Every structure is written in C-alpha cells, then in structure tokens.
C-alpha cells in the first residue's frame, strides 16, 4: 500500500523530494514483491528470488555500464544514491520490484513461453521507465545509431538488451 501511495504523489512533486520519492518507490515496491513471494511461494522461493535477481541485475547492469552491452552506452548520475560497481544500489531492487510480478503473470498465461513473455514484459516496462528517468537526469545514453521511436535520447539497442536480459532472467 505504501508503494502505491508514494506513486500517487509522483506527478505532483519535483526536485529533491522527487529524487527521494523515486528511490523510496523502488525500495517499497521491491519489499512488497518480496512479501508477496514469501506469502505465496514460501521462504525458499523468496530468498532464492531475492539473491538471484539482485546478483543477476547487478551483474548485467555492471557489464552494461562498463562494456556498453547489452543496453548501449549509458551511465548513471549520482542522484540514485550509493553505487556498487558503478550501478546504483536501487537499480537491482527495481529489477526485484518488476521481475516477480512479470514471472508470476507469465507462469499463469504463457505456458512454455514464459521466457519470451518475461522478456517482452520487462522490455515494455523499461520503455515506460526510461523516458521519465532520462528526463529527470537519473541516467543518460550516448546515442550513435537507431533510437527508440519518439525517444531520440534512448538507443534502440537498450530495448533489445532488456528483451534479451529479461528472457534470460
């Protein structure tokens, strides 16, 4: 409930309050998803989900920042707080917040295609998220090739990176 309430005021604020709100939405959302994982699937699943998703996200984001693959040439600003291996700590928790509901939905509707549904859903979430975060200066890309339609500041390779990493996760 707290994560939802925080999101309701999101369009009404700016500046430092918005920066702190952004971070809190992610942590509270991740906490809600972990609580759901615990209550719906048990302790073992919740702990496995937490650690696997956290380390996968931290690893793929670190690779992305350092090598420009698979998301393109990007960097995070200092606005998102403490960084681990050039990745803000809040970023793996954003993956935790989104991957669990995607996995839960995919298992219910996608049958043997869970991996594809998961990749598409996470890429779609990123298409929603990136324009806001770029506009707020949370991260930036150097775009040298094709870009996301109507979003010249976001390379198309980022969407494919999310599709690929989402399918793998």
What is the meaning of each model-derived region?
Residues 1-169:
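Aromatic-rich, lipid-facing transmembrane alpha helices and their immediate juxtamembrane interface loops
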């Amino acid at each position: 409930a707290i994560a939802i309430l925080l999101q309701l005021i999101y369009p009404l604020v700016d500046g430092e309050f918005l920066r702190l709100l952004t971070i809190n939405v992610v942590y509270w959302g991740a906490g809600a998803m972990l609580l759901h994982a615990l209550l719906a699937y048990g302790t073992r699943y919740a702990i496995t989900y937490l650690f696997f998703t956290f380390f996968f996200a931290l690893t793929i984001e670190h690779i992305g920042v350092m090598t420009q693959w698979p998301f393109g040439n990007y960097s995070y600003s200092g606005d998102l707080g403490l960084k681990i291996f050039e990745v803000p700590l809040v970023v793996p928790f954003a993956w935790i917040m989104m991957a669990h509901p995607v996995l839960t939905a995919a298992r219910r509707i996608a049958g043997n295609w869970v991996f594809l549904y998961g990749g598409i859903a996470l890429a779609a979430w990123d298409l929603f998220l990136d324009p806001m975060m770029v506009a707020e200066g949370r991260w930036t890309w150097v775009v040298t090739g094709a870009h996301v339609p109507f979003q010249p500041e976001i390379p198309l390779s980022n969407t494919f990176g999310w599709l690929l990493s989402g399918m793998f996760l």
